[in-house]
């Protein structure tokens, strides 16, 4: 149980650091993740249903995230070209710029890993990957 407690506490500390880095950019972590997802989509847009699947969020949560991003001019909704039942969320140029600035802020954070050697960081990454695979978070 000590390992689980440590992992959960580290997650809280890291999440707090990420939230603090994103706050000046007017983003929450969930909104930032949505912008990142749309940035890497082939056309810069995805069906909102697919966003929910990839972000592992309830459709209502995706709607709320897109509502806020749209209100800030970072995303726009578009009708799907071939499926009238589907709405696409598309990142705007302002959204790309905000995502880029926010990513720089997040990557500049000292997550406490600078005190580890490269080997220790690799070991930690490998161990956490094994735990994630064991609980079904992802496959090889």
Protein language model features and the residues they cover:
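Pre-recognition alpha-helix immediately N-terminal to the DNA-recognition helix
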Residues: 2, 6, 33-37, 97, ...
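N-terminal helix-turn-helix DNA-binding core of bacterial DNA-binding proteins
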Residues: 8, 12, 16-58
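Alpha-helical linker/hinge and terminal dimerization helices associated
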Residues: 14, 55, 98-114, 131-138
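Short, hydrophobic-biased segments on the C-terminal half of alpha helices
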Residues: 48, 66-67
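Charged, amphipathic alpha-helical coiled-coil/dimerization segments
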Residues: 67-126
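C-terminal regulatory/oligomerization modules of transcriptional regulators
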Residues: 119-140
């Amino acid at each position: 149980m000590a390992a689980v407690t440590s992992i959960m506490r580290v997650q809280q500390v890291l999440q707090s650091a990420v939230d603090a880095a994103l706050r000046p950019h007017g983003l929450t972590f969930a909104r930032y993740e949505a912008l990142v997802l749309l940035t890497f989509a082939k056309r810069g847009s995805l069906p909102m249903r697919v966003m929910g699947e990839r972000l592992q969020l309830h459709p209502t949560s995706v709607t709320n995230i897109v509502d806020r991003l749209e209100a800030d001019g970072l995303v726009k909704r578009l009708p799907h070209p071939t499926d009238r039942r589907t709405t696409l969320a598309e990142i705007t140029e302002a959204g790309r710029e905000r995502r880029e600035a926010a990513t720089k802020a997040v990557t500049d954070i000292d997550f406490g890993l600078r005190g580890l050697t490269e080997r220790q960081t690799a070991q930690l990454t490998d161990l956490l990957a094994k735990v994630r695979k064991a609980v079904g978070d992802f496959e090889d």
